[in-house]
Each structure stands twice: as C-alpha cells, then as structure tokens.
Amino acid sequence: MDSLATDPAFIDSDVYLRLGLIIEGKRLKKPPTVLSRLSSSLERSLLLNHDDKILLGSPDSVTVFDGRSPPEISIAHYLDRIFKYSCCSPSCFVIAHIYIDHFLHKTRALLKPLNVHRLIITTVMLAAKVFDDRYFNNAYYARVGGVTTRELNRLEMELLFTLDFKLQVDPQTFHTHCCQLEKQNRDGFQIEWPIKEACRANKETWQKRTPDSLCSQTTAR
C-alpha cells in the first residue's frame, strides 16, 4: 500500500504522517489516527442522514448490507478491532472509505446504523485483497467482523458487482480522501448520536459473545 501513500505526484507527508499512513518501523504501537478520523466521518454521515430523513423525507434504498437491528459495538471500537486482528495496512481504511462512497452513490442508499458495520468489514477486506501484499481468507475476516462466512461471501460479491469490479484507486482520489479525513473534527464538531448508547462495547462484551452473533442477520435477501 506504500505506492499510494508515497506517490511523488500527490504526496503530502504532513497529512499522511498525521493520519498514521506512513509507518516508521515494522509495527504500530497504537491505532493510527486514520481510524478515529474515519469513525468521525462515518458518525457524522449517520447523524446528517438521520436528520435529512426526518426533516426532508429523503428516500433510501434497502440493500443486502442492511441488518435487522444495529450491532451493539460502536463504529470506533469496530474499526479498532478490525485493525488489530486483520493486520492490514492503515491505508486500507482510506480505500474502504472510498469504496463505501462509491457503493452508496451507485445504490442511492443512505449510510445508517443498520448497514455501516457490514460495509466497513467488507470494504476493508476488499481493500486488503487489492492493495496489501498479505491478507487473510474470508472466514477469518468474517470472524473478526462478527458475521458468518456465508454472509460475508455474499456481501463481497454484492459490492464487487455494484462497483463493476473497479477496485483500483488512483493517487489523486486517495490523496483527496486523505485530506477530507484529516480535516475531521478540526472545527471541534462533537458527535451526539443516540445510537452510541446502544452501541457501547468493551472487551468483556467481545469475550462473552460469539463473533458470528455481533451483527444481526440482514434484512434484504
């Protein structure tokens, strides 16, 4: 993944360093900043979509990524878990953000508590497969993400066909999304999203629940 984060035509070392995309040494001692920035971006989208749907009656599409109920784990904890156990490069989370944007644009679906977790695990997995030198099989990612292998296989195929198998990301697009993520929370914006009360998760929760039960079954078939 170094090719995108270090492209000489678009490199902004300050932005990449602040996001934790340029790694000094073999292993990060703590989660990169890009995780918190991505979490803030997704949470903000959830809040804005929620307000638009109530005030404007914005239309929404149901996809196979929609579950019956929101998972109990927060987006921030979910991203940390995926990073910890998937061992993917930090840049994969920027790529995942790009894939999510493209998917929502093509399907005209809204990002919401019912689909955000499945979109995250599926897009991060695909990003690792495309851009990382090493990655795990679908069964492993399914266990990390709290879904069944069968469901993750189905989500992967849905995402691939929706994106027309166009998974390559040019350096300019990558750089633009990095800048967008880096600006998150600069204005002191604080997420006040009610789902957080139901989505708080800690280590004890993960230990007590089986991974396949962390995400509820999907609604769309």
From Swiss-Prot:
Keyword set includes Glycoprotein: no
SUPFAM superfamilies: Cyclin-like (SSF47954)
CDD domains: CYCLIN_AtCycU-like
Keyword hit for Cell division: yes
Superkingdom of the organism of origin: Eukaryota
Organ and tissue specificity: Expressed in roots, stems and flowers. Expressed in the shoot apex, leaf primordia and young leaves.
One GO BP annotation of this record: cell division
Pfam families according to UniProt: Cyclin
Keyword field: Cell cycle, Cell division, Cyclin
One example GO MF annotation: protein kinase binding
Subunit structure: Interacts with CDKA-1 and CDKB1-1.
Family the entry assigns: Belongs to the cyclin family. Cyclin U/P subfamily.
Protein's UniProt name: Cyclin-U3-1
Taxonomic lineage of the native organism: Eukaryota, Viridiplantae, Streptophyta, Embryophyta, Tracheophyta
